[in-house]
Amino acid sequence: MIPLALDEVACLCPGRLVVAPGAERVTGLEIDSRRVRPGDLFVAIRGGVEHVGDALVRGAAAALVPDDAFAAMAALGRAVRDRSAARVVGITGATGKTSTKDILAALCRPHVRTVAAEQSHNNEIGLPLTLTRIEPDTEVVIAEMGTRGLGQVTELCRVARPGIGLVTTMGPAHLELFGTIERVAQAEAEIVGALPAGGTIVLPAGESLLEPYLRDDVDVLRYGDGGDVRLLAFEADDHARLVVDALGERLELTFNFRSRHNATNALAALAVYAALGLPLAEAQRGACDVSLSRWREEELPLAGGGMLINDCYNANPVSMAAALDHLVERARGRRLVAVLGDMAELGPDAPVYHGEVGAATSRAGVEVLIALGPLARGYLEGAEGVGARLWAPTVEQGLPVLHALVRPGDCLLVKGSRSMGLEVIAEAVAAVPV
């Protein structure tokens, strides 16, 4: 972190500031007292006031109990960002933000000193945390921006001030909050309006919902079929091999992910990489160092040569369809088992979307479908071609069903919205000795 004087922290953040003896500045920021390092500023949010003493014992230079946690984090993130000449990339979109961020970070790191959001730090707390990791020599910052309402991306952009924006795949997500996919697009496209003149926006080719928000003074790069960065060929086994046309340059790249849907995320990342002026001919240097965030496309061995695909971080109709495609690609003759939890925030059409995903399981050749959660019952209604279909209202009630139906040698997908906590299922399956 670029150091901040404690006098400035006190001016920026109304509240109670407890300063360690002799401390004059902070060299890091933390909101989890267990992770505090000497010299950090500990910001007490969500009940963190109880841990102020622990943070100081661990060496914090100061502890802040802010009057307004969101405002304090924004002010601190903005203060660090304003001291840096780093180029900031902002990523929005309905699905694929975190994986695209992970791929872009891997591509950039061999060439420029890069800071990227950890996990899915993309809200009013997480984005400033990313910015406070900027060091004096940081050259590129990759900031993820989530949205739960109109105006939120605009506010996050006021803090991060990106010069390059990326909108990932659009689709029916957060409909409970926005009502229509057009309003989802409006929210995600706020990043276009926040870019400076001469900035660059990267977006999916053919995404008509975003076209009304484009500006004459912002450059546009498109990725996907018909775009500036497009996929010519794809194959995968333990690695994905992509042949790409990137701004007229033919690239052959090997990535250490396996799924076709991450190939689309890689195209988006390559477009941003090009917008940063990094050498396309050297993109392979980072391609095999992609480290996807936790609970995304994780593969673990199961008994009898089986495989668990743990993709339980989150879900919407687009990512569910992609995960089922990936299940088929990775099965290699194994029996297909899908454990699917609710897809949250889809609004009044949620039953329709769940039914469509259920139909997709049937088309994919899934032989066992275990649906978990009140909305997940809709999967069963669409999955008429699946041999064994079972539903449980909670994850806990689904565990006995899972143990009764899963056999050695199965290829099993676990996926659902974050609110379902399906990592419990994945951990239970993975705990069975191989």
Residue ranges and their predicted role:
Residues 9, 40, 55, 76, ...:
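Residue-level signal for inorganic ion chemistry
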Residues 11-16, 166-307, 334, 359-362, ...:
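Acidic, Mg2+-coordinating active-site environments of NTP-dependent enzymes
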Residues 1-79, 330-331, 359-360, 364-378, ...:
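N-terminal leader/targeting and accessory segments in enzymes
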Residues 399-405:
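Short amphipathic alpha-helix with an adjacent loop that forms part of the alpha/beta core around
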Residues 64-67, 389-398:
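Short acidic-hydrophobic, aromatic-tinged amphipathic segments that line or gate anion-handling sites
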Residues 69-203, 209-217, 404, 427-433:
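Phosphate-binding loop of NTP-binding sites
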Residues 91, 97, 294-298, 419-425, ...:
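ATP-dependent carboxylate/acyl-activation modules
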Residues 292-295, 312-386, 391, 433:
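Active-site beta-alpha connecting loops in nucleotide-dependent enzymes
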